């Protein structure tokens, strides 16, 4: 079992989907505290209740957070340190989707500036801001509380694909994976491991946003199955994230692990 007991974790985008599944698994395995940053206050309230049912001993610290704001992210991480005194691991899951299959070839001509900026601000800038703040906190904490520390950034199967659509999404996720690999080399001497997880087609509330023309969840999943992709659960991805956050995954760093469907 992955060793995360009695440790403090930060999770962006933790209120639903893969982020929530990660929080639930960390609580089951004895995490001391889960510090969740997400835009949805309502989802965080529901998540906090479910975590308390799983493990009443796990402390839950929820913050309404816009990861595209460096100042908000910096304050969030500083608050974690001031409240709990340490940060052992972080999973940066927050991201936004981009709908596919709605544009005429060449789809590039319909990739507008505002959409590009919005996707990058969350999917790549947000990764930079969160990772940077977490490394700063871990570096400072490790001098007084040495031990294995880990950051997991969530990209996507799109980071490995070359799709003639959703340019902003795919490029931002490829950037996330590349960035994390570079950070991994930079911080490993400090005892901080950084890795990427790239989920395949995952059954989450965000999945229908990738296929906006579909009328039902079943239609969304059938679209992907026809293209040769299997559909996995958020819990499947969470198990890999928690393994990377745990000491059981030492000395793994600088990887981009595909979970679920790979490119056919």
Swiss-Prot record:
How it assembles, according to the record, is:
Homotetramer.
Q: Which residues form the signal peptide?
A: 1-20
Similarity comment: Belongs to the short-chain dehydrogenases/reductases (SDR) family.
Cited CDD domains: SDR_c (cd05233)
Query: What's its catalytic activity?
Result: chanoclavine-I + NAD(+) = chanoclavine-I aldehyde + NADH + H(+)
List positions binding NADP(+). 18, 66, 132, 169, 173, 204
| Pathway involvement of the protein, from the record | Alkaloid biosynthesis; ergot alkaloid biosynthesis
Functional note: Chanoclavine-I dehydrogenase; part of the gene cluster that mediates the biosynthesis of fungal ergot alkaloid. DmaW catalyzes the first step of ergot alkaloid biosynthesis by condensing dimethylallyl diphosphate (DMAP) and tryptophan to form 4-dimethylallyl-L-tryptophan. The second step is catalyzed by the methyltransferase easF that methylates 4-dimethylallyl-L-tryptophan in the presence of S-adenosyl-L-methionine, resulting in the formation of 4-dimethylallyl-L-abrine.
Q: What class of enzyme is it?
A: oxidoreductase
Give the protein's recorded name: Chanoclavine-I dehydrogenase easD
InterPro entries hit by this protein: NAD(P)-bd_dom_sf, SDR_fam
Q: Which GO terms describe its molecular function?
A: oxidoreductase activity
Answer whether the UniProt record assigns the keyword Protein biosynthesis to this protein. no
Query: What are the UniProt keywords, alphabetically?
Result: Alkaloid metabolism, NADP, Oxidoreductase, Signal
Q: Which gene encodes it?
A: easD
- Top-level taxon of the source organism: Eukaryota
Q: Which GO terms describe its biological process?
A: indole alkaloid biosynthetic process
Q: Which residues form the active site?
A: 169 (proton donor), 173 (lowers pka of active site tyr)
| The enzyme's E.C. designation | 1.1.1.332
């Amino acid at each position: 079992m992955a060793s995360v007991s009695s440790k403090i974790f930060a999770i962006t985008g933790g209120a639903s989907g893969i982020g929530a599944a990660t929080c639930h698994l960390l609580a089951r395995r004895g995490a001391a505290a889960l510090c969740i940053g997400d835009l949805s206050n309502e989802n965080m309230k529901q998540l906090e209740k479910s975590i308390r049912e799983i493990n009443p001993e796990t402390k839950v610290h929820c913050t309404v957070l816009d990861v595209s704001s460096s100042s908000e992210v910096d304050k969030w991480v500083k608050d974690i340190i001031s409240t709990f005194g340490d940060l052992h691991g972080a999973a940066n899951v927050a991201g936004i989707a981009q709908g596919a299959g709605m544009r005429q070839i060449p789809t590039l001509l319909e990739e507008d500036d505002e959409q590009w900026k919005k996707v990058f601000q969350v999917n790549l800038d947000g990764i930079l801001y969160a990772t940077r703040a977490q490394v700063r906190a871990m570096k400072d904490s490790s001098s007084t509380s040495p031990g294995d520390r880990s950051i997991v950034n969530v990209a996507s199967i799109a980071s490995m694909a070359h799709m003639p659509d959703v340019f902003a999404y795919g490029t931002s996720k490829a950037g996330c994976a590349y960035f994390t690999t570079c950070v991994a080399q930079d911080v490993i001497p400090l005892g901080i491991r950084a890795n990427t997880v790239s989920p395949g087609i995952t059954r989450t509330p965000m999945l229908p946003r990738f296929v906006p023309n579909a009328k039902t969840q079943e239609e969304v999943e059938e679209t992907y199955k026809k293209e040769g992709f299997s559909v996995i659960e958020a819990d499947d991805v969470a198990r890999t994230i928690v393994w990377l956050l745990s000491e059981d995954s030492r000395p793994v760093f600088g990887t981009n692990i595909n979970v679920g469907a790979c490119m056919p």
